[in-house]
């Protein structure tokens, strides 16, 4: 009697276990986000133009802006923005003679500043021009591929379509301003000249 009851109980347990083994599922959604980000880096932070900035008459050579652009391209500046409607500003400081005081000509009527302007692109996307004040809004994302060897990931510079030609200059309000004059009738004072180009990227949406 006791044995029969035990067998019956075991059979019931097997029935319960069999019912519990039926498949059941539950999915859980995962929500996350990627924040808009921008970044910029350069493999070189100093470039040097090998040639004299002037011709035999001490006037600015016509190829100086292109030489600056080529030197900057060689620095391999990599930039990205993973969102849209990003702010991009390229600032250039005019080439200034070391030791220059004020923003006018020096003794003898020689110029001591050179104005030039650059247009910048990345992977075929126009970024900004130093020929205009302020930042540009770049609607599309750019710089998604991480590669130092691929020029399509680099900020590429070229002589600006507007006021890009190099020229002796004076009386700009700041080194990066667009209001530097054009002194086409001036020679350049001898000395070392320095300038700079700054790339500023700010994420949009």
What are these language model-derived features?
Residues 17-19:
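N-terminal signal peptide c-region/cleavage motif recognized by signal peptidases
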């Amino acid at each position: 009697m006791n044995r029969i009851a035990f067998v019956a109980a075991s059979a019931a347990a097997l029935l319960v276990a069999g019912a519990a083994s039926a498949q059941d599922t539950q999915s859980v959604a995962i929500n996350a986000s990627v924040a808009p980000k921008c970044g910029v880096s350069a493999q070189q932070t100093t470039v040097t133009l090998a040639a004299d900035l002037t011709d035999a008459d001490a006037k600015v050579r016509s190829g100086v802006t292109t030489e600056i652009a080529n030197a900057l391209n060689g620095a391999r500046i990599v930039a990205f923005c993973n969102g849209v409607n990003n702010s991009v500003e390229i600032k250039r400081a005019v080439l200034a003679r070391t030791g220059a005081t004020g923003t006018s000509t020096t003794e003898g009527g020689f110029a001591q500043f050179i104005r030039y302007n650059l247009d910048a692109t990345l992977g075929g996307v126009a970024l900004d021009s130093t020929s205009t004040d302020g930042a540009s809004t770049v609607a599309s994302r750019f710089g998604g591929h991480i590669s130092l060897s691929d020029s399509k990931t680099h900020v590429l510079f070229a002589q600006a379509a507007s006021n890009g030609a190099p020229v002796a200059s004076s009386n700009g309000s700041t080194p990066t301003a667009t209001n530097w004059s054009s002194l086409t009738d001036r020679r350049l004072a001898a000395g070392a000249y320095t300038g700079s180009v700054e790339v500023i990227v700010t994420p949009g949406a």
